[in-house]
Amino acid sequence: MTDIKNNIAIIRNRIKASCIKAGRQPGEIKLLLATKTISANDILVAFKEGETIIGENKVQELKEKFDALQPVAHQTHFIGHLQTNKIKEVIKYADCIQSVDRLELAEKLQRRLEFEDRTMDIFLQVNTSYEESKFGMLPDHAVKLALQFSKLDRLHIKGLMTIGLFSAEISKVRKCFQLLKRIQTELLDAGIPVTELSMGMSNDLETAIEEGSTMIRVGTAIFGKRPFPDSYYWNETKEPPDLNLGSSPAAQGLG
């Protein structure tokens, strides 16, 4: 069984060491638990350790785990690709959407939120590695799109999100994070308060923190390996097999 408590302690130590190296304070970094395929019971174990921000990639998982997690105050971020036909469900269960990457999606979110008379925190997802396999707006379009999104009063732009290049060459991964930081600076200069940078995962969080990340998204290093490669879960057009993600005993081995 995965030692979630110990793994969280290890991640906190990695954050602390990275902050010391970068001349930053550990309190500047938020830890988001990437909980795709992780059972509600395992998430509750992490909650007991004081980590209460989770990120889900699939709308179905948001719904399946919602009731089981409700007794504990927490934030749920949607970090997967969002199809427009899933907007109604996502805004019902999520507190923030980190994957807003196109004008059509932003405008449809705006209309739905107007209908429900509410607002939603969002991050803009930027494809800083220019990989065709990834979602996210291209860096060249980010500032222009952000300015358009900022006119939609139901959307509160809180930050930027990216997935670093899948590479063992740290210098190439670093360039992705540096690019997102530059885009943030441009947007701040333009008066858009994008204070959060969601970048860095289990394998590259140190580099992300050195380059200014304020939120890292960690799943594997806390909950253990998943039954499918990470690339699978970033494709919202594919539905996963029934992994029974509720609080039943069969689901507990997935973390």
Q: Which ranges hold each PLM region?
A:
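Positively charged, low-complexity, intrinsically disordered RNA-binding extensions
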Residues: 204, 219
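A cross-taxon signal for low-complexity, glycine/charged-rich
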Residues: 240-255
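Active-site loop ensemble at the mouth of alpha/beta enzyme cores that anchors a bound cofactor
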Residues: 229-238
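Intrinsic disorder/low-structure terminal segments
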Residues: 77, 222, 246-247
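A short, polar/charged loop-to-alpha-helix boundary motif
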Residues: 223-229
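Conserved alpha/beta-domain cores
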Residues: 1-203, 209-211, 225
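Divalent-metal-activated hydrolytic enzyme cores
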Residues: 214-215, 221
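Short linear motifs centered on Gly/Pro in flexible linkers and helix caps
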Residues: 3, 238-240
